[in-house]
Amino acid sequence: AVSPVQELHLQSNIAAGRAIRFSDGDSRGTYPMGLTCCLADQYSDIRFPDTLYAQKLDGDSCWRWIGIYWNWYWTHRYLDDVQNKKAEEPKPLEQSGMCILQDAQWCILRGAKQTAVIAKGGNNGESHNHNDVGSFQYLADGEAFLDDLGAGEYTKDYFSEKRYEIFCNRGESHNIPIIGDVDQKAGKEYCADRFELTKDRNILISFAKAYGIEAQKVYREIWLDENTGKLTVCDYIQCRPGVEVHENLVTRLPVSVENDSVVIRGEKHCAILHAEGRKGEFKIKTVEHLNHQGILENINVIRWDVCCDEPQNSKIGIADSKICLHITE
């Protein structure tokens, strides 16, 4: 049987130093080599990320002795066991496949060009919470084309009633629809009520509850083409007539609007974004964000209005949206 710790470790490291993190986590962080070695001593299918991204001796800015000690001890024990044929040689990360971590309501799909999409359900009352139910990240070759910002600078306000006035903790700093110009709400009751992975590699999320009373239904379907790395996200939203719906995506990378598409430029690749069900122009807004180290970052928010149909004599408005991204060289 696969233990929960083993399963999480197997799936949470993506490629090129990227790992699955939400809320106050950092997807660009290093990984604990000691823990990886400890698990590899016990389980034969543990995979090792590139050692370039292993946490160094000085990787913990707080210099916590117990973590440093076990990191050193478990690594040396594993290397001795490999040399003495008591443990298997390290194996690299897998570059394809899919996995759902149902208790956490996280899902990971991997595809060509080292692409990965990571989606979450959960609720807005989690530890170190951000209002991010239904959000996702899109990575290619170690670059985050649609990102999760992780923790901001820890200040007094960050852990007060002003927490959700800070950009990185709000829904608008995540890849989720904005409905009625209001944020998702904080609290455990604001949650996903459906989160599943189909045999066809579709992630299905229902998360109207995260918005409170503004939305009657919010369905999201996410699909990653394993052979090409193309990402497709379809949103179906029912709300009160007259309520405006906006798609909202965030990235740290440079963005431009070209030929009715959005181009997100990474160091190795570009991502081309097309949107169906769009009303009006793409709007690109740059927001200043103090990251966990207190360093100022410019975050590009990509937003557009979604066409909303209001059937005659109906008490609901219906918004359908389709987002497609593909990676170019």
Give the label of every model feature segment.
Residues 24-25, 32-37, 49-69, 154-329:
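CBM-like, beta-strand-rich accessory domains located in the C-terminal region of large
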Residues 146-150:
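Catalytic Cys-His active-site segments of thiol-dependent hydrolases/isopeptidases
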Residues 123, 151, 238:
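Short, glycine/acidic-enriched loop or turn micro-motifs at the edges of active sites
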Residues 1-145, 198:
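Carbohydrate-active enzyme catalytic cores, enriched for enzymes
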